[in-house]
Amino acid sequence: MDIKKIKKVELHVHLDGSLNINTISDILKIEKDEIKNKLIADKKCRDLNDYLQVFDLPIKVMQTKESLIRTSKDLIESFINDNVIYAEVRFAPNKHTTILTLDEVITSVLEGIKSLKVKVKLILCMMRGDDFSDNKKIIDLAYKYKDDGVVGIDLAGAEGLYKTSDYLPLFKYASSLNIPFTIHAGEADGIESINAAISAGATRIGHGVRAIESKECINKLKEKNILLEICPTSNIQTGIAPSMELHPIKKLYDSGVKVSINTDNRTVSNVTLNEEYEILVKAFDFTEEDFNKMNAEAIKHSFLSDRDKQELINILKEAS
């Protein structure tokens, strides 16, 4: 199997966690080695909150139109290198308003992700810990730009500190506007968080790997056809699994839960999507057929129109 030739879909990748080292060095006029030390998380962090500490530098950099456009274009290049045919890039607009308005932030990133080589759409992140009104603005902006490249919303941040269930009214509001959503759950927090995401009506869950702790939860995911956006390397860094060999992705996949493979944060986790595939082959003997199934499910669970989904499915079929 030539992993580089497999056509891939990535549904869970954070823009601010996937910055190009050379670009950041150029913008800040700081040596690359110093940037790496500040931008790449330890292979073993204490927990998710520890892992999230490295995001201070990316947020500092991404405060102008130029930097948002440039960092977005860089991410497109990394998709091309990984043979990605479709990606949904996520970021939190509220983190980038030191100078810009929310509209300027979003339109800058939308300009940056335009590409003739890779189909890319945007997911806007609400943040745990932000005020209800601030998060509601994100939903309204997702609705405003739904025909311009924004396809959905997410809830991200310190899951262990802010319960998923506290945000159910926001997802009820998003549902009233027919805005699709995914929710980070079952990463720092456990089954309770996943159940709350299911109750909210999420069709996808970011990470969700702690579903392995409950057969009932696994059955719910299967029954409701919910896909888990799994990020193997990141999960090891944040301590969800002690090693890749003990990561629950294979058990979840074998049990019939729909899963997709993602990098989460390409720079913070120091990993490409090709490398994630290689790691999984080594740990679990996944086959090309397995990966093709996962990518087909990723397309089906994407926030694209049915017509766009079918176009991508056809591309996968032609390649397999």
Place the predicted regions along the sequence by residue.
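Metal-cofactor-binding active-site regions of metalloenzymes
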Residues: 1-179, 188-193, 199, 203-204, ...
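Conserved hydrophobic beta-strand within the GNAT/NAT acetyltransferase core sheet
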Residues: 181-183
